[in-house]
């Protein structure tokens, strides 16, 4: 099945490896998800997308998490939820001399041949178009010619911008660059009416390149509170010191609770900079400019190894929990729901 919408998680249940272009490294992790504890086709643990945040509007920001223990040979860097997990804005396009590799929201790699400016390539197995900017308009014979015109002119004319869509009605996923020409990241989603969902990325500092804010189709603004491994380690040390100084607290702390200041630079799921999403805040709503929430809409905690440990809703209630193999970072061995 193909999921239409804001996330690129789709694909044929039997992609033929070796086809000329638009070829996935595996079958779709979001397809067959029964037969616990693993996907019977991939031989990997797969959890379909779980939605943590979705405020309705014409082009909403839907924050979901999808997990797969499948490891592609050409991975994107580890995302903000840690190894194995992907968020909708973790889509990345690798620009290589021999071709293009689209890392989707399911953790897969979809391979395309290089594109000339203005060229569009279609993957039949994935039902996905990948395009490159560089022309003001597409020829009328191109099925995406009408959808092309809803894009801002600067996007259409830039040969450095790539775009993807899985429908003739949109939306477009606009893949721009922080450091050309090595890769492109998701910066904007544009629907068939020209409305946009914008992902704001830090230009400098410890979290440079990461998404720190989102503006949805209604003009609502969200702040993505991020942390580095060093910051989590420092917070853990302060918490331990506070616990040990309290007469009512135990005098020993398990070594499993000790956070290292750094994480291994490379994992089976790709390079890991240690940046994680701690919380999501609604900071502006045009409909209620003077009434903003005093608590985050969602909050997350992590293990000492940077793996997603727990998810909390806006009431502070833990709604999900996860356990991982101590010998293999990111390999989930158990998960539970609230209650």
Segments (PLM) and residue ranges:
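Extended charged/polar low-complexity repeat regions
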Residues: 5-17, 81-83, 98-339
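Nucleotide/phosphate-binding site architecture used for ATP/NTP-dependent chemistry
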Residues: 34, 41-43, 91-92, 132, ...
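Short, polar loop/linker segments at the starts of domains and inter-domain junctions
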Residues: 72-86
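N-terminal targeting and processing segments
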Residues: 65-66, 86-90, 123
């Amino acid at each position: 099945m193909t999921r239409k919408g804001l996330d690129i998680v789709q694909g044929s249940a039997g992609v033929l490896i070796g086809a000329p272009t638009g070829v996935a490294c595996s079958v779709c992790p979001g397809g067959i998800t029964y037969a616990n504890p693993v996907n019977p086709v991939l031989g990997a643990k797969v959890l379909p997308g779980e939605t943590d945040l979705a405020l309705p509007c014409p082009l909403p920001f839907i924050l979901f998490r999808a997990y797969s223990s499948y490891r592609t040979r050409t991975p994107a860097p580890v995302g903000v939820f840690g190894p194995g997990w992907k968020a909708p804005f973790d889509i990345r396009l690798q620009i290589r001399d021999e071709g293009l590799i689209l890392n989707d929201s399911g953790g897969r790699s979809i391979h395309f041949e290089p594109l000339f400016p203005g060229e569009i390539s279609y993957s039949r197995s994935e039902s996905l178009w990948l395009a490159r900017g560089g022309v003001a308009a597409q020829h009328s014979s191109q099925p995406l010619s009408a959808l092309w015109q809803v894009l801002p002119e600067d996007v259409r004319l830039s040969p450095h911008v790539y775009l993807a869509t899985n429908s003739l009605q949109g939306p477009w996923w606009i893949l721009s660059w922080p450091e050309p020409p090595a890769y492109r990241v998701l910066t904007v989603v544009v629907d068939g009416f020209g409305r946009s969902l914008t992902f704001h990325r830090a230009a400098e500092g410890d979290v440079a390149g990461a998404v720190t804010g989102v503006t949805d189709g209604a003009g609502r603004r969200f702040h993505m509170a991020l942390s580095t491994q060093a910051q989590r380690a420092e917070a853990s040390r302060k918490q331990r010191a506070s616990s040990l100084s309290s007469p009512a607290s135990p005098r020993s702390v398990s070594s499993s609770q000790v956070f290292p200041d750094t994480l291994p630079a490379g994992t089976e799921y790709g390079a890991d900079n240690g940046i994680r999403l701690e919380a999501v805040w609604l900071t502006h709503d045009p409909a209620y400019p003077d009434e903003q929430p005093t608590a985050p809409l969602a909050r997350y905690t992590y293990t000492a190894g940077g793996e997603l440990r727990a998810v909390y809703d806006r009431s502070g209630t833990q709604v999900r929990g996860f356990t991982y193999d101590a010998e293999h970072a990111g390999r989930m061995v158990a998960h539970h729901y609230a209650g």
